[in-house]
Amino acid sequence: MSNNIHSPTVFVVQDPDGKEITLAAKYGKLHVILTGKESTDVALNKLHRVLSEMKPGDYLLPIGKSINMGIAIHFAWHYLKINSLCNPVDLNILVWRREQYEYTVETIKL
């Protein structure tokens, strides 16, 4: 009998370039999408392809160039709507809380 339980993924928009993100791993497996060196067109295509795998229960860690974060949030919302059987859908965004030295979840109902 197979186990169909979804293990959460933390989709990290861009390589953190020296910033510490390992604390986000408590929410799921870290998957860094972009290096930050891609052109906007290449970044758009890669974000589109990778975030098509996003499912309810996954997380988005928006870090990096503003345009890449905006595109990532758009695709995350789009694919969560497609990949979810629920309506509305929750988009889980990880936010760094400097004072507490931890990531917390901000959930947006879509």
Predicted features along the sequence, with ranges:
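Glycine-rich beta-strand-to-loop/alpha-helix junction loops that act as flexible
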Residues: 63-65
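Short, well-ordered alpha-helical microsegments
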Residues: 68-73
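Long, low-complexity, Lys/Arg-enriched
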Residues: 1-59, 74-110
